Swiss-Prot record:
Organism: Oceanobacillus iheyensis (strain DSM 14371 / CIP 107618 / JCM 11309 / KCTC 3954 / HTE831)
Principal subcellular localization: membrane
GO molecular function, one term: ABC-type D-ribose transporter activity
Keywords assigned: ATP-binding, Cell membrane, Membrane, Nucleotide-binding, Repeat, Sugar transport, Translocase, Transport
Pfam families, alphabetized: ABC_tran
Protein family according to the UniProt entry: Belongs to the ABC transporter superfamily. Ribose importer (TC 3.A.1.2.1) family.
EC code: 7.5.2.7
Protein name: Ribose import ATP-binding protein RbsA
């Protein structure tokens, strides 16, 4: 299928979202679509797949002008859209999720479960992925859920697959396998739209790139004819001096110390510390135990043994409330499920963790809350006209700032950040990095879990690498390289 979208306009009320966008897709190509959150990428793809119509412009598919009535019609035509927000029903099994709305039945209306399993196994084998079909999808990791979504698209036998941040929660091995599958699909004539903020992936896998900014298509280029700095300038409309802001940290005394921390089946004998003003990067492959260690420190999960000291005093943490009272804060990797209530306003979300500060004998002091939220909005440069705006209406970068504001407001001594810039555009990432620098300059200690190796190297003062639930290596900023981190992450000796 060949697609040509010309002069696409879309507005919602008085808000012009797309203003004359051009985009094309050739059979067998991988075309990257990049832009800051809010640039209009998803809106453009929603118009292509029939979620809503354009106000102006044309879509031509294989030479025929086309406008799908809905996403079901576009799916039947061979267009699959794997969205960033996973379409997984947690209470249903893996098999049920794969076939929801597309169940295979016999002439009596009974499910042909054996045939369904065979088809699912065929797709899973292509993904080199194994998981029990009767397992509840909600029990799967985020990475496993992403692969289920990809499997659903492959089962449609689609001619065009749109992928929105498909690798965000995948391990390096899973990403490599996905890229193999993508190349195999293009050889069969399938065209792929690849929406991502990961520049290294785009240069590794894509043929062309279209950059969008503020509802317009800035430029379409062949990957071989462009570079990182050019794309960043097109995305943000300005030069970014450096990808990561300069750090000139001043370290104080150890704030948090963890000793002999163990939980059977998850991690063993974890021992580390983090100092005032320091960013401790935590690296490792997916499933190594990085998040599990931090969840246990914050009191979400129990441990078998170990001790936690804050400012030299032993803590007893039985649940997150104890952790918060002690001076810990935890920004989880899944901000939309665990960090935010999307239907609530910015004010309500930021206030959730700070109710004690605004209440008097059970009554919330509204003015104090509003003043505090306004301060956080200005301090973190959250782009909004009102603090009453539902958080779900914000871009990914601004949603992440709301999560940070929510926890910074508790005045923590230690801030744990799990994948702090996942799914955030390059401009918003730099703002988050600058904020992290400001927080450490005030003496806050930050523990940053990240699967983005350039981010780990660019922002960490010290790097702790986890392999199979144990600390396999530790590196200071000056000696750290991607190769050394990956050696430790895969169980090797960094000194070999």
């Amino acid at each position: 299928m060949k697609i040509v979208m010309e002069n696409i306009h879309k507005s919602f009320g008085s808000n012009n979202v797309l203003e004359g966008v051009d985009f094309s897709l050739e059979p067998g190509e991988i075309h990257a679509l990049m832009g800051e959150n809010g640039a209009g990428k998803s809106t453009l793809m929603n118009i292509l797949t029939g979620l809503f119509p354009s106000n102006q412009g044309s879509i031509t598919i294989d030479g025929v002008k086309t406008q799908y009535k809905d996403s079901k019609e576009s799916e039947q035509a061979g267009i699959a859209f794997i969205r960033q927000e996973l379409n997984i029903l947690p209470q249903m099994t893996v098999l049920e999720n794969l076939f929801i709305g597309k169940e295979m039945t016999n002439s009596f209306g009974f499910l042909r479960e054996k045939v369904m399993k065979e088809k699912a196994e065929e797709v899973f084998s292509r993904l080199d992925f194994s998981i029990p079909f009767d397992k509840e999808a909600g029990e799967c990791s985020v990475g496993e859920q992403q692969l289920i979504e990809i499997a659903k698209a492959l089962m449609l036998d689609a001619k065009i697959i749109i992928m929105d941040e498909p690798t965000a929660a995948l391990t390096d091995r899973e990403i490599d396998k996905l890229f193999e599958i993508m190349k195999e699909l293009t050889q069969q004539g399938v065209a792929l739209v690849y929406i991502s903020h990961r520049m290294e992936e785009i240069f590794a896998i894509c043929d062309r790139i279209t950059v969008m900014r503020d509802g317009i298509s800035v430029k379409t280029s062949w990957i071989k004819d462009t570079n990182y700095n050019e794309i960043v300038k097109q995305m943000v409309g300005r030069e970014l001096d450096e990808r990561y802001p300069e750090r000139t940290p001043t370290f104080g005394k150890p704030v948090l110390q963890v000793n002999n921390f163990s939980r059977k089946g998850y991690f063993n004998d974890i021992k580390f510390s983090v100092r005032e003003g320091e960013i401790l990067g935590v690296s490792g492959l997916m499933g190594a135990g990085r998040t599990e260690i931090m969840r246990a420190i914050f009191g979400i999960d129990e441990v078998d043994q170990g001790e936690i000291l804050l400012d030299g005093k032993k803590l007893t943490i039985k649940d997150p409330t104890d952790a918060m009272k002690a001076g810990l804060a935890f920004i989880t990797e899944n901000r939309k499920d665990e960090g935010l209530v999307l239907d609530f306003s910015i004010r309500e979300n930021i206030g959730l963790s700070n109710l004690n500060s605004f209440s008097n004998k059970g009554f919330i002091k509204g003015k104090d809350e509003k003043d505090f939220v306004e301060l956080m909005i200005k301090r973190l440069q959250i782009k909004t006209q009102t603090q009453e705006l539902p958080v779900g209406n914000l871009s990914g970068g601004n949603q992440q700032k709301v999560v940070i504001a929510k926890w910074v407001g508790t005045s923590p001594r230690v801030l744990i950040m799990d994948e702090p810039t996942r799914g955030i555009d390059v401009g918003a990432k730099r703002e988050i990095y600058q904020l992290m620098n400001e927080l450490t300059e005030r003496g806050l200690a930050i523990i940053m879990i990240s699967s983005d190796l350039p981010e780990v190297l660019g922002m960490s003062d010290r790097i702790m690498v986890i392999h199979e639930g144990e600390i396999s290596g530790e590196l200071v900023r000056e000696e750290a390289t991607q190769e050394k981190i990956m050696t430790y992450a895969t169980g090797g000796n960094g000194h070999e």
